[in-house]
Amino acid sequence: MAIIKRGVRQKTQPPAKRTTNIKKATFDSGKKKEVGVSDLTLLSKISDEHINENLKRRFENGSIYTYIGHVLISVNPFRDLGIYTDQVLETYKGRNRLEVPPHVFAIAEAMYYNLKAYNENQCVIISGESGAGKTEAAKRIMQYIAAASSSHEASIGRIKDMVLATNPLLESFGCAKTLRNNNSSRHGKYLEIRFNAQFEPCAGQITNYLLEKQRVVGQIKNERNFHIFYQFSKGASDRYRKTYGVQLPEQYVYTSASGCTSVDTIDDLNDYEATLEAMNVIGLSQAEQDEIFRLLSAILWIGNVTFMEDDEGNAKIADTSITDFVAYLLQVDAGLLVKSLVERTIETTHGMRRGSIYNVPLNIVQATAVRDALAKAIYNNLFEWIVDRVNVSLQALPGAEKSIGILDIYGFEIFEHNSFEQICINYVNEKLQQIFIQLTLKSEQEEYAKEQIQWTPIKYFDNKVVCELIEAKRPPGIFAALNDSVATAHADSNAADQAFAQRLNLFTSNPHFELRSSKFVIKHYAGDVTYDIGGMTDKNKDQLQRDLVELLNSTSNTFLATIFPDTGDKDSKRRPPTAGDKIIRSANELVDTLSKAQPSYIRTIKPNQTKSPLDYDDRQVLHQVKYLGLQENVRIRRAGFAYRQTFEKFVERFYLLSPQCSYAGDYTWQGNTLDAVNLILRDTSIPVTEYQLGVTKVFIKTPETLFALENMRDKYWHNMASRIQRAWRRFLQRRIDSAIRIQRAIREMKHGNQFEQLRDYGNKLLGGRKERRAMSLLGYRAFLGDYLSCNELKSKGAFVKRKAGINDHVVFSINGQALHSKFGRSAQRLPKTFILTPSHFYIIGKTLVNNQLTYAVDYKIDVRQIVYVSLTNLQDDWVGIFVSNSTQPDPLINTYFKTELITHLKKLNNRIEIKIGPTIEYQKKPGKIHAVKSQINENAPPLGDIYKSSTIMVRRGRPGNCSQRKKPLSTRLPDTYTTRETGYKNAGHPTNIRQVQEPTHISHSQQHTSSNLGFVYSLNPSAVNHPRPVPSGSVGTTSTPPKQAASAAQAAYNPHKLGGNMDNSSAAYGNASALPNSAPSQAPKPASRPVPKPAPRPGPKPGPKPGPKPGPKPAPKPMPRPAKSVENSVPRPNAIEQGKTAPPPPPPPPPPPAAVPSEPVYEAAFDFPGSGSPNEFPLKKGDRIYVTRQEPSGWSLAKALDGSKEGWVPTAYIVESKAAFSQLEQPVASSAPLGNSGVATREAGTTSAATAAASAATPTAFSAGLADALAARANKMRHEDSGSDDNADDDW
């Protein structure tokens, strides 16, 4: 990667100037040979294995540092590589991190430089496994900052010394030997080094997080207590030994129980001297040091207190001399100490009044726990006092403005037995992981904003859901459940643990949580961790019992009283903060602090468990690579721009790739450098999506693009050949796809449609025993099965299928409802999703978990276990499924496609019996048959039913022996086109339909809506007995019915919209005389209104404006009615043919201007009772309304003429009213007398007035006209292009 020089931060910068002194690249023979890649974002293949291989190669070469962008990866070498000397440190001063090899000094230099250059707070987050080198990295950063901010002032030097002295002091009190690390930090630490206006360290601040105080009283085998106990017991002076009774560590239970008092690589005596020196540098007085060691002695002697049983089985002190000496060290009364250890005081309350006080004796186990609690409390408070005392010393100088923070915190822990300490540690790591991703993206965005780069925010897994699972209060998280359990059973730890286990049942629906008897699992970002419930509530209390508090408050030692301040009002009813509350507060404060600083990151890796400088354990390192999420970090970095370079450097590197910039290896371009960059990118055919040009830099998105540029010189023509091959393959694939579509159409013509055949099979299964809904009999109704598209890759159905854990092929899927019964309550109809696979039937429910929608399987039914399905003989949609040998109640479900569901079940299991009768029988409880009755009720919703008290009330449906209607002929919509390459279909906008449709042509698209909704109008005149909703339209135009919610019949197949009137929509199949050709009748327009001029478009032109039709007498009020019209009775030849055979008639004389209302007035052509929604506007036939807005979905926003009410109505139910203009219009002389039809209609020039009058004279003329119209229609369809097959594929 080329070098990037720093520049002054500016929002905008002028374009790069012309550069003419570009030199040829030269080979640096003195550079160390690079092994692997120094930045993991340049790896060709991103996987955990490839990252591990690269780290191994560099480790074996002595290169322990690697970058991921600005993140540093450090592998512990377990040896001195000589890379931390002053000479090495000097080479990194003032150098960009890309100018020198990866190093922790480069991170420190970048932090210090950014602090000075941008005056922004800096921080470094160091994370990794225990023993991976986190503390060492923190030391090196402090070493570099102290050296880089050199000053000759004594006060500044003293602050530097104190900052460096915090390391040995806090290591002694906060680190211990573990199985994995001889100097493992057992607490989190955030050190802020604060700088004055001259960027010199003038102050500091240390924040402590979660000391592992449990280690004070017990360790596992071959581990040790905190270092200070061994340092003090081995190196204490004679004065301390005489005054405090200090013995060797083998004499104390707390330091010898684990069997490890000495470590080969640790010199406790030397470390003790370093600790004393650090205390002196920080400024601890001798008196303060004496008190610290006094309490350390007391803690060691407390561990030697043992108990034995008395005659009553209670605990008593085995050796009172030890308690006497402990009382001497703590300066408390010995009798009170003994009483506090073996007894517990309990006080009862009666409301707001105090009750009786009892002294309850403890057994040996309880007394031992009290003893350990006292020792842990003293050490924890002592450690916090030391941190506070260090902070007091570090605040010596004023004037601190900016800071550099160093976070050294424990890593993610997964042990065989994990308890409260591990969940706290892992919770903090979850918070750090969250801020790591957020701040990484933030820094990326800032650079893109500086260079004015457009980019899309990176999508990544946000572990906020896991953090909320642990820390949330509403709904309660795990810590909140712990607090509630403690409050419920405060005195009894076992009872509190049981209460906590019960509360964990609340989290079972969370996908990141699992409950396993006495354990629970949290799915952290770094892996699943199993936690033990036992003992968690007791550790969460983090509170001394009342007797110990009174004991410590009675001390005469002022220092002990200082570290145990008065707890306040003892009678307060407020719950004291628990350990969980403290860690949540500390973690959130840490996140706030880090969010206010510019972050840097160091991820440390431990190469082996043997601490050998030569071993590299691939399996162990691979585990850490996954644990630290390095692959995710690389992908986040690469999701933005993996490579960025200044224009000059980019041109210098790649000018050979453009013939306009080079000739025979020489740079020949004389223009602007930015133009040269554009030429290179253009001539190399780099997609514009793969790069962006900023103010001074070019950004390459992926490393593969960069590598392609590097290899383009040799492979340019190969790439061009590949593009030609790719285009040819695309052409061949298009031909194959076209052939497949033709073959599919031919197969359907020969063998029929399998979906329609399945529908017919389903109708036979019903056997005429059940009343049918009108929508079930439509010709376009076919059994497609997977209505939710569960088998597709990206769809809502696929999402539900994935969440439900279904891997099989889906045969049938639909949304519906299921009856949910509760004891003592009315049954509820809950929305459900039904999915049928070849082996199981799933009923899936959805719930909100942490404000996120999730799906879960409520029922999983083996298809082979279904004995029968039960239905009523009415038109309702309820189905009862009887399952044998089931421990759950049988499901009673409601779905519009019940017949199709039963058909698929019957196909999968032929033994299933279909019971149809007046009742539905199913098992409401296992082994208990329950019957649901059905009855006719005309007050039921038109499109649904009413379920109440085990009774289904529904309207009368179609007879069960009704035959299925024939499928209408399929044709392409006149305003629809299909893009061959993309398959995108443009259905057009309703406003455009008026401009492009021919006024004389009744398109077949008027006879049915979108096939997905299944609402069609039959072409068979004998099947049409009643009027249908008439869509509104302009003069001389026809509108296609809306695609969505055009009528109530459409809504019948939409489970989410139940608007409309079923009776009106179903009436469209009865009266043949009402609508002879199934086309929407056109409302007659007054002659005084001008005809809108259609927009020019290719293809046939619409005919001229027609004149008034002849008739017996003029109509006083021309109103649109669903009746037989003269216009619809006349055969209409094709517009092109008509243009060739006869000239158009002359237009009528221009009408005088007429007053027009401010908003169009429409009239209801049919009754629209609505579905009960407050957003709908129920109408009666003949009601007049204003229409303020029409939506493409098929709904119009209507308003009463007096403005008293407003709501939505189906556009197909209303027609534009002419009565509103009747008083404003003036009579206009027509060019021909009116006929006797009673309705004045406009003719678009396709037929003569005489032909129209003759057609209206007799009923036989109507039949002949209809036949001629159908014949003309069929003739036109034969001449249409082959694209009609595309629309046929979209039908039911």
UniProtKB/Swiss-Prot annotation:
GO terms for cellular component: actin cortical patch; actin cytoskeleton; cell cortex of cell tip; cell tip; cytoplasm; mating projection tip; medial cortex; myosin I complex. CDD domains: MYSc_Myo1, SH3_Myosin-I_fungi. Phosphorylation of the TEDS site (Ser-356) is required for the polarization of the actin cytoskeleton. Phosphorylation probably activates the myosin-I ATPase activity. Residues 956-991, 1017-1180, 1227-1258 are annotated as: Disordered. InterPro entries: Fungal_myosin-I_SH3, Kinesin_motor_dom_sf, Myosin_head_motor_dom-like, Myosin_TH1, MYSc_Myo1, P-loop_NTPase, SH3-like_dom_sf, SH3_domain. The modification Phosphoserine is found at residue 356. The myosin motor domain displays actin-stimulated ATPase activity and generates a mechanochemical force. This is Myosin-1. It comes from Eremothecium gossypii (strain ATCC 10895 / CBS 109.51 / FGSC 9923 / NRRL Y-1056) (Yeast). The gene is MYO1.
